[in-house]
Amino acid sequence: MSVMFDPDTAIYPFPPKPTPLSIDEKAYYREKIKRLLKERNAVMVAHYYTDPEIQQLAEETGGCISDSLEMARFGAKHPASTLLVAGVRFMGETAKILSPEKTILMPTLQAECSLDLGCPVEEFNAFCDAHPDRTVVVYANTSAAVKVRADWVVTSSIAVELIDHLDSLGEKIIWAPDKHLGRYVQKQTGGDILCWQGACIVHDEFKTQALTRLQEEYPDAAILVHPESPQAIVDMADAVGSTSQLIAAAKTLPHQRLIVATDRGIFYKMQQAVPDKELLEAPTAGEGATCRSCAHCPWMAMNGLQAIAEALEQEGSNHEVHVDERLRERALVPLNRMLDFAATLRG
């Protein structure tokens, strides 16, 4: 029997916070990026969790702001020869797997993800080997090497539907790496799921007691929760879903005040969707506790204006994403299954 890697004992060294830019410096880099995007025939693909000024720039230049599933779709279909991926490393890898003919640039190749870090490929392969009768489903937040071992890749926006489908076929599942999302999906579908025990450092920090106190302070507020959060937080929610699903819920819920339990980067697009509603951050630290991420992924914060300009200007090994071709071809199989399945859901 394999010994499972224990993410709870792993130490994830946080990157240094980017040096703040002055107003003039921000204006300089914004104009430089706009010029370089045109010169490089490039387009920005940014995740909801990047800083607001990055999302705004993606909007202004005809790029994409979305969850990881739509980032993958957009980048593959866009005619630009270069994709500037503002996010974390697995997103850049996914873009390269789906668009091998394109140049994939990232502001930094050191933008990690705690879910990815918490699922080392050697330990995961041993875990899968110990359960050969199970279908392997991995979250998009994993390395290309882990995706190679998967039968399916999935994002949070279609996780419940996919596992419900596989369960209807009588398949038993290995789910990796997020234990909270896996538990949520199991509860929603009743599927036979064996979970890897990873967690997102942002969502894992939401505190039940502190959220209860905030709810008591604002009893008229609805609570929106990403399913990467602990079960006790999910149980308090008026709406549970992926980033795009939470934005949709913000529009449909009648409440004028919303408590949001996910990375605060989502507030940029959510506030656009509901300009007349008040958005409150769910607390990440209770009494006597401190937060590490404080509701914002430290690696997402590495996607600054200066780093984006340098990526477009310098290209090369410090910014370009490469995936071994044999690895890419194998990882493409479960990714394409995900995209094909998602297309059937859209009808």
From Swiss-Prot:
One of its GO terms (molecular function) is 4 iron, 4 sulfur cluster binding. It is found in: Cytoplasm. It catalyses: iminosuccinate + dihydroxyacetone phosphate = quinolinate + phosphate + 2 H2O + H(+). GO terms for biological process: 'de novo' NAD biosynthetic process from L-aspartate. Signal peptide: none annotated. Its cofactor is [4Fe-4S] cluster. Belongs to the quinolinate synthase family. Type 1 subfamily. This is Quinolinate synthase. The gene is nadA.
